[in-house]
Amino acid sequence: SPPVCGNELLEEGEECDCGSPANCQDRCCNAATCKLTPGSQCSYGECCDQCKFKKARTVCRIARGDWNDDYCTGKSSDCPWNH
């Protein structure tokens, strides 16, 4: 089925989906189009802060056991597994 903008599920073709325009509280996301607002790089994620990607080498997941800390790349809002 085609993506539905406004259902709070990020689907193919959408950059963000914060719900209906009446309920959206995300200034990084245009609720009517499910696209990022002008100047925004992201709207969510461990490596997203105030609509921008966090700087590279920012810790996004603390080490546990034998694993190393995980770091933002500066190019994505996702926190990659670096172990």
From Swiss-Prot:
It is found in: Secreted. Expressed by the venom gland. Residues 2-83 form the Disintegrin domain. One of its GO terms (cellular component) is extracellular region. A motif (Cell attachment site) lies at residues 64-66. SMART domains: DISIN. Its main location: secreted. It holds the Pfam family Disintegrin. Disulfide bonds join C5-C24, C16-C34, C18-C29, C28-C51, C42-C48, C47-C72, C60-C79. The keyword Disulfide bond applies. Keywords: Cell adhesion impairing toxin, Disulfide bond, Hemostasis impairing toxin, Platelet aggregation inhibiting toxin, Secreted, Toxin. GO terms for molecular function: toxin activity. Inhibits fibrinogen interaction with platelets. Acts by binding to alpha-IIb/beta-3 (ITGA2B/ITGB3) on the platelet surface and inhibits aggregation induced by ADP, thrombin, platelet-activating factor and collagen. The disintegrin belongs to the long disintegrin subfamily. Monomer (disintegrin). Belongs to the venom metalloproteinase (M12B) family. P-II subfamily. P-IIa sub-subfamily. This is Disintegrin isoform D-3.
